Amino acid sequence: MRDDSGPPLEEDQARPPRALPPVPSAIQVCSSFVENNSRMDQQDDLVGEDDIPLSHPKKKKSRTKSSLATASSEGHAEPVVNRRAEGSEPPAAELKEHPEAPAPRRQKKIRPPPELETSLTERPSSPSLLRNENGIDAEPREEAVIPKPRRKAKKTQPAEPQYASELGVEDEDILTDEQSTLEHHSRFTAPTGVSQPVGKVFVEKSRRFQAADRSELIKTTENIDVSMDVKPSWTTRDVALSVHRAFRMVGLFSHGFLAGCAVWNTVVIYVLAGDQLSNVSNLLQQYKPLAYPFQSLLYLLLALSTVSAFDRTDFAKISVAIRNFLALEPTALASFLYFTALILSLSQQMTSDRIHLYEPSVNGSLWAAEAEEPILVPWIIVNLVVALLVGLSWLFLSYRPGMDLSEELMFFSDVDEHPETGTKASP
């Protein structure tokens, strides 16, 4: 209800136009379109019956439901309906005044081309005349909306790594074979094709990739592996172990050579002395040039053989060595026999010197008359015992030539501490 308490306005005095609220651009276009339709309806009423072609019946263009729904949702549907009703009043009055005249037909409105409709919808809202309650056209107060130009988003291309300066392209790097076109796969799916081996491979040399034949590359890698296997890195332990094994082989040779020399020495002595040592003077005269060289060689071989035999025995643990000797262990027995033979050979070294200096006419004090036999008999017996001891030692060591207890102690002590590994010392 309107408040009528205010002073009444005079009929002759026109009311000032009331300012309407700003209308959105879409609603404004819709209202202008409705106003144009109402004006065209008024013009159609004024046209005569003869001017309207009969072949074209009147068709009333209905508004789209979407425009009415949009107008009603924005709250401006009532003004549009009221304006439509006001615009339709004059034709009804004329029909009442002239009831006999036939109802005039309206002309078919020509639909503007799509270019104009597009320009009409895209054009910014122009100030249109709207009618207020008194029927006076008034311009709505609305700020012109300037459409903002849309900027097309440019796709950022990933920066390509600049490796052209570092990696050069050579003629041999370019493959002349026909290359099949690669199918475009999605980024996150693995290719389903099976890779085929290529005859050429690219190897980086001095910060550049060079083409090389696959077969030649495989040969070079195999040669490198073989050379690495042939020349392993040696440690101090490996050198000591190799020297120890080499000396063991030399000692084994000296054992056999010493046994042969001792037996030969004994045979020569008994042959030169005759039966029952009856010709001692002949022994002294014939054995004189052989005394020094042969006794020196015999002493050298005895020393090497004794050290080699001791090297095979574990003397770091005295109790273990004594137990092995009492158990008649071959290496322990050979060591004891060689040491005994060396002591006996040294005990008869003075007699060997006297044999070397045998001259009855010059050195009569060294060899007195009838004193030759008592001096030579012990020397002959000692040489016989040395030959027997050396021969037995050689037989004991020949029974087990690869046995070396000191090697197991010095180089394979970690194997003894962890017997569960099942590793044994190599001979």
Curated annotation (Swiss-Prot):
Main localization of the protein? membrane
Biased composition, Polar residues: where in the chain? 28-40, 118-131
**Compartments, as annotated in UniProt:** Membrane; Cell projection, Cilium
* Compositional bias segments (type: Acidic residues): 43-52
**Chain intervals for the UniProt region annotation (Disordered):** 1-172
**Entry-linked InterPro entries:** TMEM237
The protein, known as? Transmembrane protein 237
